């Protein structure tokens, strides 16, 4: 697969704007399309044009944006059960130096506001009532740790790996945060990350 950072770098070097926000996101094109990954005001759907994907029957299927169901926040429905193998994107021509400058500005903004330790990005979808990070902070859970998984002291909607964290460390921490949010604020937190394995139906 192709990392988003590589795609952003290629676009910048070739004077193609619209991909600046991708730099620094720890993901690959295929998974990012499924999740409609986004940051800094951009997302995958905004630059997506077409794709070839493997469906549940093992057949290759072509997808063109204008014939697909509209994307939602953190989901492109047509890729929920289809594995993207190849994708084409559309950008806007621009000056490579200006594009690189915006890319670097986004990178610095991300470094200043998001933890640099390994993580899966934002853990929870923002509920209507309050941003998830603010809620978790108000619950006093910044820095709360289970095993080697920790609620980031920098941004409470990130669960970071302090070193060799187990999947159970992360899922137990998610469980604890959700239970506290429900008990103390009456808010049900929905995970933004996709949990795969024995407990995936619970998230």
Where are these regions (language model features)?
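Core subunits and conserved enzymes of cellular information-processing
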Residues: 7, 23, 30-41, 82
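A glycine- and small-aliphatic-rich helix-loop capping segment at beta-alpha/alpha-beta transitions
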Residues: 10-16, 35-46
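Anion-binding (especially nucleotide phosphate/pyrophosphate-binding) glycine-rich loop
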Residues: 1-29
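Gly/Ser/Thr-rich helix-start
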Residues: 2, 25-32, 39, 122, ...
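Short polybasic amphipathic segments
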Residues: 49-53
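N-terminal short leaders/motifs
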Residues: 2-9, 37-38, 73-79
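Short glycine- and Lys/Arg-enriched binding-loop motifs that mark or flank ligand-binding interfaces
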Residues: 20-27, 34-37, 117, 143, ...
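Phosphate/pyrophosphate- and phosphate-bearing ligand-binding catalytic cores of soluble enzymes
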Residues: 54-175, 179-203
